[in-house]
């Protein structure tokens, strides 16, 4: 399961975002829907289920389906708070960077209203530019990667003087513990014009440009423009968007209020919906709070933006699609009769054999062929899967 880190400075709503995103209580298989550890929790990728399209009543086992909407568990990490100088170990810098080693992508929660300074101290709304926060996080990550590469750089460059590929391998070895792939490094080298140039000729500026590209590829980031209901957040949101960064407007506080109300059975609300329904007797303060959320957030922005941020990160940044493996292509069920039991998130471009390995190593090792259940067609190992495919894996080895 891929892991997305939620980052941000103090007082921007980072922990509120994390709490709201991970508090939905739904019974799914054997997943522990408490916090995995003090700073890792389960959120959900929300997608339209194929059950209604295929005219079946599903019985999910690794996810949940609510009125034709499939919620698939994903992992979020509440990364230690960040202050300038983290790359040098200031504050919780070392903890922050250690957390980030594991992350496949980031959600950077920023105070779009500009009501906190660079250190997270409360100030007059509009007196701080949230783009400064975005740049400082990017800068700290770049310096962190740069420092890792610079350590032993002389040795790396000398030992690969006559063998460029050896240099690439050594760079990958230095960064492999950070969930950075060799392919990411090669893409970054190509983008910076350093391909096949002797490493001994690379300047520190070359290295800095290289790590910037690596960071964009290996730690792609969605900006969650939080406190969107406060002025001048909408203007700052547009300003951030104009830089070409991936940005979603949100109100983490509004989402947390709605999820808590739904948890107490006061309202009916599914994360990401543009509406909620009051189903219990409410006091005047509760009614007023919900009316404000509807007026200031949902009616204006379509939703609170928290679920949209999660979905955008996993679907657009990480390039994941949803596939439904089954054991019987006619009944669309597993051996216990559960219809559309599992929904898996896999990388766009993945093959039938990739899916087999994701389900279980034994299935992958014994892979013979797969069946596209929609079309009733037999497909081979290299068949590229599409979003919402329903697939049966036929293997010489049983699933363990």
Model region roles, listed by residue range:
Residues 2-7, 12, 18, 153-390, ...:
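C-terminal-of-GTPase-core extension/linker across diverse P-loop GTPases
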Residues 48-49, 57, 385-387, 391-392:
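S4-like RNA-binding module at protein N-termini
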Residues 1-162, 175, 216, 220:
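Conserved G1/Walker A P-loop phosphate-binding module
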């Amino acid at each position: 399961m891929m892991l997305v880190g939620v980052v941000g400075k103090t007082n921007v709503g980072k922990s509120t975002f994390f709490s709201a995103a991970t508090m939905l209580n739904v019974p799914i298989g054997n997943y522990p829907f408490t916090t995995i550890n003090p700073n890792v929790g389960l959120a959900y990728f929300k997608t339209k289920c194929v059950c209604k399209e295929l005219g079946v009543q599903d019985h999910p086992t690794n996810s949940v389906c609510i009125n034709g909407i499939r919620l698939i568990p994903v992992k979020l990490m509440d990364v230690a708070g960040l202050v300038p100088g983290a790359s040098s170990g200031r504050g919780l810098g070392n903890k922050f960077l250690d957390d980030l080693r594991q992350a496949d992508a980031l959600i950077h929660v920023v105070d779009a209203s500009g009501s906190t300074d660079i250190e997270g101290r409360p100030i007059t709304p509009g007196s701080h530019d949230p783009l400064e926060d975005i740049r400082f996080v990017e800068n700290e990550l770049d310096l962190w990667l740069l420092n890792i590469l610079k350590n032993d750089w002389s040795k790396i460059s000398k030992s690969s003087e006559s063998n460029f590929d050896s240099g690439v391998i050594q760079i990958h070895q230095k960064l492999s513990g950070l969930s950075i792939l060799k392919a990411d490094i090669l893409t970054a080298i190509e983008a910076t014009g350093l391909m096949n140039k002797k490493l001994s000729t690379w300047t520190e500026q070359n290295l800095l440009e290289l790590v910037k590209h690596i960071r964009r590829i290996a730690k792609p980031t969605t900006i969650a423009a939080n406190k969107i209901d406060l002025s001048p957040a909408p203007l700052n949101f547009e300003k951030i968007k104009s830089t070409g960064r991936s940005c979603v407007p949100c109100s983490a506080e509004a989402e947390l209020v709605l999820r808590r109300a739904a948890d107490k059975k006061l309202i009916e609300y599914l994360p990401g919906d543009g509406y909620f329904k009051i189903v219990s007797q409410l006091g005047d303060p509760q009614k007023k709070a919900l009316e404000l959320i509807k007026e200031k957030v949902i009616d204006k922005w379509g939703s609170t933006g928290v679920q949209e941020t999660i979905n955008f990160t996993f679907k657009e940044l990480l390039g994941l699609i949803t596939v439904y493996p089954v054991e019987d292509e006619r009944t669309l069920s597993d051996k216990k009769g559960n219809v559309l039991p599992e929904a898996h998130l896999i990388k766009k471009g993945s093959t039938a054999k990739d899916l087999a390995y994701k389900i279980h190593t034994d299935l992958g090792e014994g892979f013979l062929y797969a069946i596209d259940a929609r079309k009733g067609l037999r497909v081979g190992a290299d068949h590229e899967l599409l979003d919402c495919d329903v697939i049966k894996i036929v293997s010489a080895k049983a699933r363990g």
